[in-house]
């Protein structure tokens, strides 16, 4: 059986895979907020929001601090450089593949033109 090791990048992508968590990050990008404020904004229960914040916290994207009864959330110090580099590698790969596909399409159009066929658009 294959076993997979969860890495930091896996945790980040798992955290970012949910629209609510992406919204929380966007909201925290403007200013810190309590879990109660976030729950109200996203029309969720406190328990539901705590779970979302926990996932973001495990990925290092959010930090929380409890003062009295209020848990305040803020963006984590960790940036997404590793994730951006991973995405960039695949962007470059696909750009190269699409460039090659464009060349093949251009060659086929030239062949059709040379054979007297009406070129496709």
Where are these regions (language model features)?
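Pre-recognition alpha-helix immediately N-terminal to the DNA-recognition helix
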Residues: 22-24
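Short helix-coil-helix linker/hinge
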Residues: 15-20, 80
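C-terminal regulatory/oligomerization modules of transcriptional regulators
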Residues: 1-8, 27-46, 55-58, 63, ...
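Extreme N-terminal segment that seeds HTH/winged-HTH DNA-binding domains in transcriptional regulators
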Residues: 7-17
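Short, Lys/Arg-rich nucleic-acid/phosphate-binding segment
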Residues: 66-72
């Amino acid at each position: 059986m294959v076993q997979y090791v969860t890495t930091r990048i896996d945790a980040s992508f798992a955290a970012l895979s949910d629209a609510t968590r992406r919204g929380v990050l966007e909201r925290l990008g403007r200013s810190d907020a309590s879990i109660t404020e976030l729950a109200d904004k996203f029309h969720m229960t406190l328990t539901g929001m705590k779970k979302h914040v926990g996932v973001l916290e495990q990925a290092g994207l959010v930090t929380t601090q409890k003062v009295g009864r209020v848990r305040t959330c803020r963006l984590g110090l960790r940036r997404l450089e590793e994730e951006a580099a991973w995405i960039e590698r695949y962007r470059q790969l696909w750009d190269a593949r699409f460039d090659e596909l464009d060349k093949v399409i251009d060659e086929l159009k030239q062949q059709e033109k040379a054979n007297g066929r009406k070129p496709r658009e």
